[in-house]
Amino acid sequence: EPKYVNLNTIHSPEQMAKLAKISAYFAGLPTLKKDKLRQCQYEAICNLESSFRQGQRRALICLATGAGKTFTACMAIYRLLTYTPARRILFLVDRNNLGRQAEGEFGTFDLTEKGEKFSNIYLTEFLRSTKVPSSANLVICTIQRLYSVLTGQELQDDEDEESTFNNTDSKRAKLAGQLHLPNDFFDFIVIDECHRSIYGRWRSVLDYFDKARIIGLTATPSEETKEFFNNNCVANYTLEKSIVDGINVDGRIYRIRTEVSDRGGQIEEGEKYTEVVKRTGEKREVRADELIPYSASDLDRA
């Protein structure tokens, strides 16, 4: 005769995978419900999870600005922490102000099984020191802050606020000696604005965590970005498509003409002006030692 056991509650997909002794990392992921998700977000998450199931370790999500990249990341991260063995995820931001925004979005995200806020379920830590709480499930920080955590070196406030976009040609930071985190500390790394954050000076920091699967978020992928993610773009939702779908509105260009933009101008002898090295973003204040005329066509030239 068949045997049965009375169940007080229905098993979750994660519990069913364990009972069936299915060891695949993503076996416990349930079918994603489209509730409250935009079509582009729904497709991005479905394609992301499918990509990981197929063995990919890096995936790029390209969503137009305004389409909800961070909300998409919140949903994807919640599902990874809830339905897979992942226990710690890093959310890399380009600057501290973006980190504070992300912390706020995770704090209000409640598209969870029971409607609880993400930060009430999983400990979310926005790093402001060189210590990572061992109990943290989601760690938010800049790559500069992550470097300070690894090496134990304190950062100056302006270093943590500096965009990595201006460091693409800088000398790479070196990781030497005893590092303070193992290379398998994070199960996943999600890189916000990934066209900025993963190259140049700080690339070695990201390369150190070679056990983690990596997810990139951007609206403007470069060829270098695509190459880093092995050309595995799981979503490509353009601005034009978002306008057609009514998520964004088309722009109107109003050209404002000034005397300088029409005819040019001049920098007087002894007048101070700022020189900017476009490649590095380096700025320095200079005093003109003679009259410097410029034409309208000289404006904004590199």
Question: What is the predicted function of each stretch?
Answer:
Residues 1-88, 93, 97, 101-113, ...:
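ATP-dependent helicase/translocase motor core
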Residues 76, 101-106, 201-208, 228, ...:
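Alpha-helical scaffold elements adjacent to nucleotide-binding pockets in ATP/GTP-utilizing enzyme cores
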Residues 85-87, 135, 185-186, 210-213, ...:
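Short glycine-/polar-rich loops that comprise or flank the Walker A/P-loop
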Residues 96-98, 144-148, 195-196, 220-224, ...:
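Conserved nucleotide-binding/hydrolysis micro-motifs of P-loop NTPases
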Residues 124-139:
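Conserved motor-coupling elements within RecA-like helicase/translocase cores
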Residues 139-142, 213-218:
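Structural recognition of the conserved hydrophobic beta-strand(s) that form the central parallel beta-sheet
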Residues 157-215:
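SF2 helicase catalytic motif II
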Residues 226-302:
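Interdomain helical connector at the RecA1-RecA2 junction of SF1/SF2 helicase-like NTPases
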